[in-house]
């Protein structure tokens, strides 16, 4: 893994909720999540990074001036995988 992409972490989609920046390995990813009412969203990015306590399923991230919502997190021994949904409305 190459931690060569700068990621800004936010507690909300609001730019004033900035927490910190980290470097991570960001990869394209495609998975759909279907909800009961037929609503579907696509997970389009997967982030690999060191375990970071400031990242939760309530977090938002900014990568290359685009905002994402954290949808899922898988923690391993020494790193974590974070699955992201690209926001349609860039706040």
Regions found by a protein language model. Name each.
Residues 50-55:
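Short, surface-exposed secondary-structure edge patches
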Residues 68-70:
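Short, isolated positions in well-ordered beta-strands
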Residues 63-65:
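Structural motif
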Residues 1-48, 72-91:
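N-terminal disorder-to-order initiation segments that are Gly/Lys/Arg-biased
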């Amino acid at each position: 893994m190459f931690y060569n992409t700068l990621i800004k972490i936010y507690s909300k989609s609001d730019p004033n909720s900035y927490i910190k920046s980290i470097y991570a390995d960001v990869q394209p990813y495609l998975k759909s999540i279907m909800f009961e009412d037929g609503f579907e969203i696509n997970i389009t990015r997967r982030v690999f990074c060191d375990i970071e306590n400031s990242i939760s399923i309530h977090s938002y991230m900014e990568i290359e001036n685009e905002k994402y919502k954290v949808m899922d997190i898988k923690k391993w021994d020494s790193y974590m995988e974070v699955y992201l949904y690209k926001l349609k409305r860039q706040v």
